[in-house]
């Protein structure tokens, strides 16, 4: 029977979820993950513990619009209309309530600590049995690894406790509540709590029991906490594993602790001691604690490059050796410190190749499983990332174990963000909110501090800078002086951070915002008195078709030692799968669930799609972050390793010399490069060239053998150099046949053999081509100066809030999208060996000329049409997105073949990873399926393009697909695109960069803007 004090009415009256001073009731203290092995060998080998039982699976569930709607009877028995849901899960992914995507704006009315009366409430219940032996002795705990956002727990009708902080565990002692036979849990989860004001991260707002639930049985006398640290001499040849162990229960003289250190099957060191430690103050020391030090000679050091893992087993036993219980953790011998303005790992300065990562799955919301976690780690390792920031909350506990073992440096971040407050530090400078903030920081440290992968603590994200931050910074530095602390809020260089950690600071451009100026990263280093390292906590906003200018950051990182890298925003698009009326899946973003407020597609900033398929930008990141750098001098290649600890032992350098994509010579050389060392490779003499073209040398570093994170044949680095400037685009000598010109009132028509070209005299455009009786064009060949806007072009502009500074708004206001061609000249001349068409167009909007385009088309007896284009840009119009030509071809061919940069999509400010070669891909692969459609699929540096019966030659950029720029511009989601008739071809003489320093302000560097007043390009169009 439910007691009065346990009743739902009492809980509702207290309203713990609207009291920042109440963050938990009856919750146990935080500690590292426990398993309570009763066999030390099982602890050493990390076998499943018989004392740890998962409660994941099917639970009964009922959703209510508010906690007051929950009937009291639910505490005792399931309701008749209960459904079944799987735990862990977000209830929004099961059709209850709607997920809300918002970045800054709170999804609730801002009135802390109060939340809406209509507060969606999920009521979970589970019936289970426990082992009889668990009831006879010891302590049985229930562990919730993550519940969003707050919950009350009952067991067998009796109230157990309360917890909040969605991203850290809540653990309760169930011993007094369990009974023999059947037991029933009831968990009331509230969508909103006062904790929601500290959880205003840029992500989907979801609810429920979304991480694992488990039971743990501990002995009455037990290990209650343990902490390991590694200490070194100056040259890292000797180490001490320092283990501090705390117990709970009856403190008996016969109790002992043994800590043993293992490397595989080999015991490296061991030590035993009774409880009781050093004197702390005049009252003595801790009787329930003991610290042991194990000496280790020549430890194998841990790093992301070589993640050597030991295993520490902590045994609580009696003096005669009878084991009471054992706990264990992985150990990595490594040292992190900041010295002389540099972040050092094991004495070496790190270069952080980092990425931010939200816990996100397109089908499961914020539920992470081991397969997805491993998939993400493999993606990072294979693409030369060595670090991850847990943005913006502590991750699933398993994540850290996997990072330890695969090798990633981790920034562990507290679940604190108050981005929507005005000012942002309104709560973080308020002492009433210090207890809530404190629990989120201190419990993170207590849970995760044994992980070697965690090299930096973060106090949270975008919460201004308040006195609470200063207090928590000092707490961490006192409790764990072995790691630096970072925090970006309040200007990225406050007293609460050991690292200057700005977000979206640019390489050379200052952003002098009031109170919190964002200096260029180069300038920041030179500020008076500033000696901290700089690591960007967020940079290179990878939203849609982005990451332009990424190479500029890496040039700076390699030039200035104290610029120690950064974390790209971010890894994974946060789109969610919805289904149409026919059951077909499609990718949804903010607003697609009827969610308000929402920030539309701003949730999709990933280097990979939500299903982990890579964006083309991922290849650029991989190339810029590669650990081998190359320098060519004559026939000598100098290979420099940026590895700090890895001596190349599984790398071959493959080299190829090719002329217009045709290999002339190749070879391979084993790499034997010491960490931070060099190797010089001499190439043989090249064969004599007997034809013209572009000569390129390409090198790839290939791993012949599989590793823990890559398959055999993995390419880790590459570089390419052009060896000769001998491209010839001159036309062949005059042919024997002469094309025939026919003039009518409406057209100029040129005929040659079975080919015809028709120019409309009223429009001045090439209106049709024939090969035999087959028409080749569905639309005329026209100038093109616009592109379907990128996310970076749109910025923060939207229908209800126009940003006049956004590129797309500037183009719209100037009339670029609405411009119409006025024909100024259209003439035809018969030459000795060719026909020459000359046209001049003025592209105008509302009587104003924006562009003047002068073109000549020279059709000779070989059937080649040489097109020369000269464009004048009005001085007072915005720089255009592109200067090129477009038409709709009648054919739909299966494949596209080109000689140029590829194979992936590339743009003028994102092409360092692309290689010059002859590429051949299916037409469908020339389109990049960004969830929010935009300009995509460009290939730069093209010398030859072949599609169907057509060939284009010159020096141009192109994209080709079934979708017009107009359709891409007008369509909100990729699944709504329809393949149009024929194929759309865009050939650009010049294309503006895409930017990517951020996505809310113009970020295309000046050198990649089309700022000149005149442009000239030419190409040849012929039929094969």
UniProtKB/Swiss-Prot annotation:
Keywords: Glycosidase, Hydrolase, Magnesium, Metal-binding, Sodium. GO terms for molecular function: beta-galactosidase activity; carbohydrate binding; magnesium ion binding. The keyword Hydrolase applies. Its EC number is 3.2.1.23. Binds 2 magnesium ions per monomer. Binds 1 sodium ion per monomer. The active site is at 462 (proton donor), 538 (nucleophile). Gene3D superfamilies: 2.70.98.10, Galactose-binding domain-like, Glycosidases, Immunoglobulins. It holds the Pfam family LacZ_4. One of its GO terms (cellular component) is beta-galactosidase complex. It comes from the Bacteria. Na(+) binds at residues 202, 602, 605. GO terms for biological process: lactose catabolic process. Its cofactor is Mg(2+); Na(+). Substrate binds at residues 103, 202, 462, 538-541, 605, 1000. It catalyses: Hydrolysis of terminal non-reducing beta-D-galactose residues in beta-D-galactosides. Mg(2+) 2 binds at residue 598. It is an enzyme of class 3 (hydrolase). The record marks 358, 392 as: Transition state stabilizer. Mg(2+) 1 binds at residues 417, 419, 462. SUPFAM superfamilies: (Trans)glycosidases, beta-Galactosidase/glucuronidase domain, Galactose mutarotase-like, Galactose-binding domain-like. Belongs to the glycosyl hydrolase 2 family. Homotetramer. This is Beta-galactosidase. The gene is lacZ.
């Amino acid at each position: 029977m439910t007691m009065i004090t346990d009743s739902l009415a009492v809980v509702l009256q207290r309203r713990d979820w609207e009291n920042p001073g109440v963050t938990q009731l009856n919750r146990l203290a935080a500690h590292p993950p426990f398993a309570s092995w009763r066999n030390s060998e099982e602890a050493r080998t990390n076998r499943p513990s018989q004392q740890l039982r998962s409660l994941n699976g099917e639970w009964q569930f009922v959703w209510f619009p508010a906690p007051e709607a929950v009937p009291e009877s639910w505490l005792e028995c399931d309701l008749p209309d209960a459904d079944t849901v799987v735990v862990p899960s977000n209830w929004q992914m099961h059709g209850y309530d709607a997920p809300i995507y918002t970045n800054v704006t709170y999804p609730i009315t801002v009135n802390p600590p109060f939340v809406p009366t209509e507060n969606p409430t999920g009521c979970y219940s589970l019936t289970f049995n426990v082992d009889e032996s668990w009831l006879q002795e010891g302590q049985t705990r229930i562990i919730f690894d993550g519940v969003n956002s707050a919950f009350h727990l009952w067991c067998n009708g009796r109230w157990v406790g309360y917890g909040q902080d969605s991203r850290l565990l809540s653990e309760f002692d169930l011993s007094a509540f369990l009974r023999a036979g059947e037991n029933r849990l009831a968990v009331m989860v509230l969508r909103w709590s006062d904790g929601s004001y500290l959880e205003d991260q840029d992500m989907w707002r979801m609810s429920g029991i979304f991480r694992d639930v488990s039971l743990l049985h501990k002995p009455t006398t037990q290990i209650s906490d343990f902490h390991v640290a590694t200490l070194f001499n100056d040259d890292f040849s000797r180490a001490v594993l320092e283990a501090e162990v705390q117990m709970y229960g009856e403190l008996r003289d016969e109790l002992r602790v043994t800590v043993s250190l293992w490397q595989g099957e080999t015991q490296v060191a061991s030590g035993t001691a009774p409880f009781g430690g050093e004197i702390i103050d005049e009252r003595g020391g801790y009787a329930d604690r003991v610290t042991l030090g194990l000496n280790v000679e020549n430890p194998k050091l841990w790093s992301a490059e070589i993640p050597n893992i030991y295993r520490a087993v902590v045994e609580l036993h009696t003096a005669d050796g009878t084991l009471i219980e054992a706990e264990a953790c992985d150990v990595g011998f490594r040292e992190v410190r900041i010295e002389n303005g540099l972040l050092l790992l094991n004495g070496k300065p790190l270069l952080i190749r980092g990425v931010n990562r939200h816990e996100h799955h397109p089908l499961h919301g914020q539920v992470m499983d081991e397969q997805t976690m491993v998939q993400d780690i493999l993606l990072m390792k294979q693409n030369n990332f060595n670090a991850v920031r847990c943005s913006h909350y502590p991750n699933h506990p398993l994540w850290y174990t996997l990072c330890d073992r695969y090798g990633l440096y981790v920034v562990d971040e507290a679940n604190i963000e108050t981005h929507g407050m005005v000012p942002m530090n309104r709560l973080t400078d308020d002492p009433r909110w210090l207890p809530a903030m404190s629990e989120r920081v201190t419990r993170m440290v207590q849970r995760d501090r044994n992980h070697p992968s965690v090299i930096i603590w973060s106090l949270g994200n975008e919460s201004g800078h308040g006195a609470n931050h200063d207090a928590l910074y000092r707490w961490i530095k006192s409790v764990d002086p072995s790691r630096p602390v970072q925090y970006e809020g309040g200007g990225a260089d406050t007293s609460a951070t050991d690292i200057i950690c700005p977000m979206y600071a640019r390489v050379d451009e200052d952003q002098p915002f009031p109170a919190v100026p964002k200096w260029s990263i180069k300038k920041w280093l030179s500020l008076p008195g500033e000696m901290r390292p700089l690591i960007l906590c967020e940079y290179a906003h990878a939203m849609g078709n982005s990451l332009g200018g990424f190479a500029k950051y890496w040039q700076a990182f390699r030039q200035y030692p104290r610029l120690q890298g950064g974390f790209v925003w971010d890894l994974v698009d946060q789109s969610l799968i919805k289904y149409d009326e026919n059951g077909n899946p499609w990718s949804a973003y903010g607003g697609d669930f009827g969610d308000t407020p929402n920030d539309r597609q701003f949730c999709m900033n990933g280097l990979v799609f939500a299903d982990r398929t890579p964006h083309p930008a991922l290849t650029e990141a991989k190339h810029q972050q590669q650990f081998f750098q190359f320098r060519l001098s004559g026939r000598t290649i100098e290979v420099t390793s940026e590895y700090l600890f890895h001596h190349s032992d599984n790398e071959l350098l493959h080299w190829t010399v090719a002329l217009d994509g045709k290999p002339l010579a190749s070879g391979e050389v084993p790499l034997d490069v010491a960490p931070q060392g060099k190797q010089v490779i001499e190439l043989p003499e090249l064969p004599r060239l007997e034809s013209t073209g572009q000569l390129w040398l390409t090198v790839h570093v290939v791993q012949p053998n599989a590793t823990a994170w890559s398959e055999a044949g993995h390419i880790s680095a590459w570089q390419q150099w052009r060896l000769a400037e001998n491209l010839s685009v001159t036309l062949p000598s005059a042919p024997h046949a002469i094309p025939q010109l026919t003039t009518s009132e409406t057209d100029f028509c040129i005929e040659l053999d079975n080919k015809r070209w028709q120019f409309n005299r009223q429009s001045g455009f090439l209106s049709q081509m024939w090969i035999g009786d087959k028409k080749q064009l569905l639309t005329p060949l026209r100038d093109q100066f616009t592109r379907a806007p990128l996310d970076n072009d749109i910025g923060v502009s939207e229908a209800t809030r126009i940003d006049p500074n956004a590129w797309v708004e500037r183009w719209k206001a100037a009339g670029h999208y609405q411009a119409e061609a006025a024909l100024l000249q259209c003439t035809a001349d018969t030459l000795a060996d060719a026909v020459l068409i000359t046209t001049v167009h003025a592209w105008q909007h509302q009587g104003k000329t924006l562009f003047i385009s002068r073109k000549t088309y020279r059709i000779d007896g070989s059937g080649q049409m040489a097109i020369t284009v000269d464009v004048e840009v009005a001085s007072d119009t915005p720089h255009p997105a592109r200067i090129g030509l477009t038409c709709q071809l009648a054919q739909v061919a299966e494949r596209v073949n080109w000689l140029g940069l590829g194979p992936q999509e590339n743009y003028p400010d994102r092409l360092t990873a692309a290689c010059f070669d002859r590429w051949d891909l299916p037409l469908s692969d020339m389109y990049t399926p960004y969830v929010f459609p935009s300009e995509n699929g460009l290939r730069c540096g093209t010398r030859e393009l072949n599609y169907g019966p057509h060939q284009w030659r010159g020096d141009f950029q192109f994209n080709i697909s079934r979708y017009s720029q107009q359709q891409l511009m007008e369509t909100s989601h990729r699944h709504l695109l329809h393949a149009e008739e024929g194929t759309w071809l865009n050939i650009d003489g010049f294309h503006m960069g895409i930017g990517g320093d951020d996505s809310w302000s113009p970020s295309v560097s000046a050198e990649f803007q089309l700022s000149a007043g005149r442009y000239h390009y030419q190409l040849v169009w012929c039929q094969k």
